[in-house]
Structures are given as C-alpha cells and as structure tokens.
Amino acid sequence: LPLRGKILNVEKAMQHKVFENQEIINIYTALGVTVGTEEDSKALNLEKLRYHKIVIMCDADVDGSHISTLILTFFFRYMRELIESGHVYIATPPLYLVKKASKKEYAWSDDDRDKLMEDFGSGTSVQRYKGLGEMNAIQLWETTMNPDSRTFRKVTIDNAGEADRVFSMLMGDEAVSYTHLTLPTTTIV
C-alpha cells in the first residue's frame, strides 16, 4: 500500500481526525481489520486480517526514519494487537551501492560504506540512495524484497510503558529531535 508522503501524526491528532484521515482508512481497508469484537467493542478485530507480515518500507535516511516512526506510532496507538501478534516488520533498504568494476556491495551505514571503499581500493564508486524510488526494480528486489537476502526487523513491545514514553517524546506536543537518538535494535527476521 503506497502512502502519499507522511502519514498523520496520530500522537497529536484528535481521535476523530485519525479515523477521518484517508491514508489511515486505506490502511484499515488494505489490512482487512476492523474495530470491535464480541468481547470488546474497542478491540482491534484481526479475524479478517489479509496479511501476516506487514512490512513498513521507507527510505533509509532521516526522513524515512521519521515516516517509519509516524507509522509505528499509529500501529502502537491504534493497532497494537498487530505488533503484539508479531505481524509488523520494518524493511531495511541500503543507503549506498559501492562498486568497482564488476564487484558491487550494498552498504546500510556510513561505516559499512567506508569499509567497502577501503576493501575495494582506488577506483571505487559510490551511489547514495536518497530514496527507494532511486533504485531500479532489480536493486529493490535484491536489497529489500527478496526473501533470500532481505533483512526485516520485527517490531516488538518489550516494555509498553517505555514505548509509550518514547512515542510521546518523539511525536507528541513537546517532541524532541530524534535524529541523534539511538533506539534499541529489534529482532532481525
């Protein structure tokens, strides 16, 4: 499901605005989930869930991290059952393609890039991906979509209180800049 730009920041929005937002309506529709079960009228109903892996795939840069955080905030606040049931993952596209002659490797960080450049030696070229749209279909498949070579980070909630605090800190009215914040790594799948 392609989202257009940044999803609504549900941390700051009134609840009625969340459910009026077209991108959020599209997420509910695409996933096939509804609100309300026989036991709890406010619980997320996963009976008709269409996908068992919901993959958040954003650019590998700071803007992509911000969009991922907006989406994760939505899932945490409104679809927490999906996270608790192990359905939510984050794709990890590379930041760089490092090439020399016929050798090529992808790098997911500046440190990875620097090591590859050192290993490849002089004559190495580097392509930085500003976004997923800059990759051709083959590159996107090789790095982010191919089940044999992709890396997904499974989203888990180890401490709901701490997660609540972090989402409020990052996305709330008194949000701090998260460009320098290091969050714990998640499970690699």
Predicted regions and their residues:
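Single conserved hydrophobic/aromatic residue that forms the stacking wall/gate
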Residues: 180-189
